């Protein structure tokens, strides 16, 4: 049997990190973070004054799958920004558990790989249901600045409950010093929260101004 570190498979030949937990999730280190604006990866190439901005991935997964497929091709682009969020690969509750864990692993592998190249990373915290709590916080730093999104979770009773349960669990386990909150903030959420308007909100505001 081949030694796995020499197999060009799922980026293992690029770097093999020591992992955390049962699924060997790469660790994201705690970084000191400062930025003036929060923009999506889909605007990265056209962005001006990128040194003052943080790059996020609150987008459809297909828009940043290429980062996993060709990670070295995007190091120079990403390194132009003040900091970058770890990729927000989806953890939908109806996804098979294996896919959810794989997406969590990919998020952490890319974030840890970027940190190896001197890029500052904000951990994007995500979960699906209560069962995911067994692994979805593996590899996340404690007492760090983190980011979460409530987009798509507040228009359904069950989704909203799952979001709040995960939020409470995040606060207990990670004790974040600051939470960059993308989207609507439920009244039950607490902590040192900095709200960022989601693209959908900004779009609605523009449409209202045009009337």
Label each residue range with its predicted role.
Residues 1-93, 109:
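SEC14/CRAL-TRIO lipid-binding/transfer domains and related phosphoinositide-recognition modules
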Residues 47-48, 55, 67-208:
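Eukaryote-skewed repeat-based solenoidal scaffolds used as protein-protein interaction platforms
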Residues 3-4, 209-211:
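Alpha/beta catalytic cores of nucleotide-metabolism and tRNA/nucleoside-modifying enzymes
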